[in-house]
Amino acid sequence: MPKEGITPRAQDYSQWYLDIVQQADLADYAEVVKGCIVFKPTGYALWEAIQRGLDDRIKATGHVNAYFPLLIPKSFLMKEAEHVEGFAPEVAEVTRAGGEDLAEPYVIRPTSETIIGYFYSKWVRSYRDLPLLINQWANVMRWEMRTRPFLRTTEFLWQEGHTVHATEEDAERETLLILHEVYADFVEKDMAIPVIRGLKSEKEKFPGALRSYCIEAMMQDGRALQAGTSHNLGQNFARAFDITYTDQHNTIQYAWTTSWGVSTRLIGALIMTHSDDEGLVIPPRLAPTQVVVVPIYRNDAERSVVMEAVQRMTAEWKGLLRFKVDDRDNLTPGFKFNEWELKGVPIRVEIGPKDIEKGSVAIARRDQPGREGKSFVPQEGLTARLAALLEEIQQALYRRALAFRETHTADVTTYEELKQQVERGFARCYWAGTMEDEKRIQEETRATIRCIPLDQPQQAGRCIYTGKETTQQVIFARAY
């Protein structure tokens, strides 16, 4: 039975998603600011967990954090033609300040390649200054016409890395390092979301990039979500902003740059990959609260005994598990069970007077709602048992998501088969079409090339649209 207030996925997937966001208390609509949301404490705690996991990996690969201005001179955006064309419709401008018209308008940061490129041109002088590896955590504004909480909002939070290198090979190595060792590693291991690592098509690549790499995930409605991108910018931005260095032979060279980013849409990916009709489901490694304890008692005397047992039990957990004891006296145990299930806490521990007598507790797994996920276990050795169960849940969520993707991905050999397959999931096919061909397919099916998988077949096949022989396969899907 679906939770009250949550539309079943099978009935209306889009409304189900919005219901989860609101019922799990993740966000509120900022009606007074078009397309923006308020991150409520529960939603922001998820973003903090995402930040920690990514920030550790970003720093482990040799990068450092910095912060650059929110306002960017409009002239900076105009310096890279392909870049400005790609972002112009989404840009918000500041034209007045201090009661006066500005001599030059500012744009509110849609992304930071241009202003960071300006500063890099001042900081980089010699090959000894390279590589320059900087990341920033920031907010971004893009004037979206159709918004949806976390997935597409006018203002969103993200990290964006910007690096400078002496050679194209170094820049390419950096781009793939971020894709594999930071983004894919985090999303698969911490978020339990399987991803396809690939290259963007010319139509879908980042404006101004030489090559764009991505990780693509499948949501429970079969649609794709781009979970992260890593761009080799070539020398385009280096030439636009004069980022040069003197090499070992005392010759001035243009540098090679990269940029890469993920955003709060990862929260949307988490919701749509793992959650169910009972509410939010959070993978244990990412969960702000991994275990919630619900003490059960009927009077003050029982309360005293139970709470003493809870304190002894949880004393062992400190530093090992992220836990919360729900000792609110004004709510029934049933209400608490429902609330924590709705909020996606991976494990619920129930303990009452009878459990204390038996030396046991009841454990309920969030990934298995109802009787299937409930069991009684001894209090002795509980800490180790909970830690093992959290890891078991983490792996189970990943396997379930991977199995779903595999059963909703199919190889297609004709355009008609592609049209049918994108109704239910990913269509994998041989492709030798043009950008115009891809645009026509999007107009007819609402599907795009999500990526050209890095894992390509050895044998050749025929393009589903042109009939030409090719060894390149792509993934077509509808996307968020």
Curated annotation (Swiss-Prot):
Gene Ontology CC annotations of this record: aminoacyl-tRNA synthetase multienzyme complex; cytoplasm
EC number, as in UniProt: 6.1.1.15
PROSITE patterns per the UniProt record, alphabetical: AA_TRNA_LIGASE_II (PS50862)
Keyword presence, Protease: no
Matching InterPro entries: aa-tRNA-synt_IIb, aa-tRNA-synth_II, aa-tRNA-synth_II/BPL/LPL, Anticodon-bd, Anticodon-bd_dom_sf, Pro-tRNA-ligase_IIa, Pro-tRNA-ligase_IIa_arc-type, Pro-tRNA_ligase_II_C
Known catalytic reactions: tRNA(Pro) + L-proline + ATP = L-prolyl-tRNA(Pro) + AMP + diphosphate
Domain text: Consists of three domains: the N-terminal catalytic domain, the anticodon-binding domain and the C-terminal extension.
Protein name per the record: Proline--tRNA ligase
Gene from which this protein is expressed: proS
